[in-house]
UniProtKB/Swiss-Prot annotation:
Cofactor(s) of this protein: Mg(2+)
Enzyme Commission number(s) from the entry: 2.4.2.-, 2.4.2.22
Reaction(s) catalysed (UniProt annotation): GMP + diphosphate = guanine + 5-phospho-alpha-D-ribose 1-diphosphate; XMP + diphosphate = xanthine + 5-phospho-alpha-D-ribose 1-diphosphate; IMP + diphosphate = hypoxanthine + 5-phospho-alpha-D-ribose 1-diphosphate
Chain sites annotated for binding Mg(2+): D89
Binding site for 5-phospho-alpha-D-ribose 1-diphosphate: R37, G38, R69, D88, D89, L90, V91, D92, T93, G94, G95, T96
Localization in the cell: Cell inner membrane
Function: Purine salvage pathway enzyme that catalyzes the transfer of the ribosyl-5-phosphate group from 5-phospho-alpha-D-ribose 1-diphosphate (PRPP) to the N9 position of the 6-oxopurines guanine and xanthine to form the corresponding ribonucleotides GMP (guanosine 5'-monophosphate) and XMP (xanthosine 5'-monophosphate), with the release of PPi. To a lesser extent, also acts on hypoxanthine.
UniProt name for this protein: Xanthine-guanine phosphoribosyltransferase
Residues engaged in binding guanine: D92, I135
Stated family: Belongs to the purine/pyrimidine phosphoribosyltransferase family. XGPT subfamily.
GO molecular function (one): hypoxanthine phosphoribosyltransferase activity
Metabolic or biological pathway, per its Swiss-Prot or TrEMBL entry: Purine metabolism; GMP biosynthesis via salvage pathway; GMP from guanine: step 1/1; Purine metabolism; XMP biosynthesis via salvage pathway; XMP from xanthine: step 1/1
Amino acid sequence: MSEKYVVTWDMLQIHARKLASRLLPAEQWKGIIAVSRGGLVPGALLARELGIRHVDTVCISSYDHDNQRELKVIKRAEGDGEGFIVVDDLVDTGGTAVAIREMYPKARFVTIFAKPAGQPLVDDYVIDIPQDTWIEQPWDMGVVFVPPLSGR
């Protein structure tokens, strides 16, 4: 990945609220299925905004930090997704999204970020991201002191 897009906690919450507003009325949903691990924080934010208490997970592994690898389903939520929102942080090349669609064909699949290759596979997303850009999520970063450029 040649570029990086840094996401702050504030930005993530703003984007999640925007996405939640598109999922109203909340009463239409039985629950949320968060895609582990990237969808866990967005899933919690959507659950808060929509007042949803039933939150489950589907655990899929496809990355080692910034290296994509073979898809592995570790754990899945039951059912076909009817009445559920499935949420992930990002749709990238679409590998995970294809697996999600197969597991939960009746769910509404949403992400905060979407790259061009994966956009057609999700029902909704908030932010367009170029395909060659790596997203640095706030849960992967720490706040550190950075000395001034002048050194004083």
